[in-house]
A protein has these predicted regions:
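A short beta-loop-alpha structural element at the N-terminal edge
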Residues: 4-18
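Acetyl-CoA-dependent GNAT
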Residues: 7, 24, 29, 35-95, ...
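Amphipathic alpha-helical recognition patches that constitute DNA-binding helices
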Residues: 15, 87, 131
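Alpha-helical elements of Rossmann-like donor-binding domains used by nucleotide-donor carbohydrate transfer enzymes
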Residues: 15-18, 46, 104, 108, ...
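Conserved beta-strand segments that form the floor/walls of ligand-binding pockets within enzyme
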Residues: 61, 73, 87-91, 100, ...
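Conserved glycine-rich acetyl-CoA-binding loop
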Residues: 67, 81, 93-107, 115-116, ...
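Conserved catalytic-core motifs of GNAT/GCN5-like acyltransferases
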Residues: 82, 120-126, 137, 142-158
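Terminal substrate-recognition subdomain of acyl/acetyltransferases
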Residues: 156-169
Length: 169
């Protein structure tokens, strides 16, 4: 298995939508529930263009051959006081869990973020998602706090950790 990680292109729009919809069906760790993502290919192409045009945002994809198996989105702050930071969201297809794809995406995002001049990266993760929590801790993210009952998943309130990583510069 050779995994490649690269910035998303507009031509990835359909595959990104399919991948994100599959993630929503496979796990409750994603923000959206199954059926909630109603984006068209043009919507996704516009999102990729919009984020690529901003110096503090990006979309990365991980591919196993021609199959899109992971993605990471970094959305940078829009107002001056937040432009030094970005919020990350990462998803890997269940079929490829435990193969280091999350690590590859996060490593690529960290490299990109230094070049983009970002000082702060942040994210949230379900407190029960121990695999993802371990990944983020290994890459220098720290827990800043708990967002209590921040999500309602299958009729139950779920806590999330708010995590961040500060970079020199």
């Amino acid at each position: 298995m050779t995994i490649s990680v690269r910035p998303a292109k507009e031509s990835d729009a359909a595959n990104l939508i399919s991948h994100r919809r599959a993630l929503m069906a496979e796990t409750t760790f994603m923000l959206y529930e199954q059926g909630e993502l109603d984006k068209t290919e043009e919507d996704e192409r516009a999102r990729i263009r919009r984020l690529a045009a901003r110096g503090n945002s990006t979309v990365l994809v991980a591919e196993d051959g021609q199959l899109l198996v992971g993605n990471l989105t970094a959305v940078g702050g829009e107002v001056r006081r937040l432009r030094h930071s970005a919020t990350l969201a990462l998803g890997v297809a269940r079929s490829h869990w435990g193969r280091g794809i999350g690590s590859q995406l996060l490593s690529a995002a960290l490299t990109w973020s230094v070049g983009a001049g970002l000082h702060r990266l942040e994210l949230t993760v379900h407190t029960s998602n121990l695999q993802a929590l371990g990944l983020y801790l290994r890459y220098g993210f720290q827990v800043e706090g708990v967002r209590r009952h921040s999500l309602l998943v299958d009729g139950r309130y779920v806590d999330e950790y708010l995590m961040s990583r500060l970079q020199d510069g």
